[in-house]
C-alpha cells in the first residue's frame, strides 16, 4: 500500500511507500515545490523567480543546475555542473530555431508561414523535412537518407493511407464517428 498526505492547498506533502519509506515535499507561499526529501534523507532543493519559473535546482551533493528564460517565459538555457550550457533560441513567433546540447552540438529547425516545422537538421547538417496539406496534416516526411514516407487523409483529417519508404501501403478505415475500425498492413 502507498499512502499520500496533502496540505490545505491540496498539495502533496508526503508519500509513504509500501516499505514505509516517506518522501516529503515542501512548497513556497506561491505553491512552487521547493524541496523533496526521499526516504533515505536525501534532499533536492528548487528555487524560482518572481514569475514562478524554476531558476535553480540543487541535488543532495550540493550540485546546482541553473535555468534562464526570456521575457516570454521560454527556457533559454540550462547549466549543469561539469557540463557546457544547453541553450535554446527562438524566432519572433517563439518557434525553437536552434538547440545546443551540453556537448556543444547544434540542432536547427525551420518553419513555414503557418509556424509548422518544415525541416530539422542535426549537428552534421543532415535534415528531416516535413510537408503539410492546407489543413496542416503531415503529407510527407523525408528522412536524412532522402527516403520519403507519405500520408493521405480523408476530409475529416483521419489518416487513410501511409506509404512507407519502400512504397508499401498501410490503409486505415473509420466508422461514421471517425473511430478507427481497421488497419490493413502491407503484404
Residue positions per predicted region:
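Beta-strand elements of repeat-based all-beta scaffolds
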Residues: 1-17, 21-38, 42-59, 63-80, ...
Amino acid at each position: 500500500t502507498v499512502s499520500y498526505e496533502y496540505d490545505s492547498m491540496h498539495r502533496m506533502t508526503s508519500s509513504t511507500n509500501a516499505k514505509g519509506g516517506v518522501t516529503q515535499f515542501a512548497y513556497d507561499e506561491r505553491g512552487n515545490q521547493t524541496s523533496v526529501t526521499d526516504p533515505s534523507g536525501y534532499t533536492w532543493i528548487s528555487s524560482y523567480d518572481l514569475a514562478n519559473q524554476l531558476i535553480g535546482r540543487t541535488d543532495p551533493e550540493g550540485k546546482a543546475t541553473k535555468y534562464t528564460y526570456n521575457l516570454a517565459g521560454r527556457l533559454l538555457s540550462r547549466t549543469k555542473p561539469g557540463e557546457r550550457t544547453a541553450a535554446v533560441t527562438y524566432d519572433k513567433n517563439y518557434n525553437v530555431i536552434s538547440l545546443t546540447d551540453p556537448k556543444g552540438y547544434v540542432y536547427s529547425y525551420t518553419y513555414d508561414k503557418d509556424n509548422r516545422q518544415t525541416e530539422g537538421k542535426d549537428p552534421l547538417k543532415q535534415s528531416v523535412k516535413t510537408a503539410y496539406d492546407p489543413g496542416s496534416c503531415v503529407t510527407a516526411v523525408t528522412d536524412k537518407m532522402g527516403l520519403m514516407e507519405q500520408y493521405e487523409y480523408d476530409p475529416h483529417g483521419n489518416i487513410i493511407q501511409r506509404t512507407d519508404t519502400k512504397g508499401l501501403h498501410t490503409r486505415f478505415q473509420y466508422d461514421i464517428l471517425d473511430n478507427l475500425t481497421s488497419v490493413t498492413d502491407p503484404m
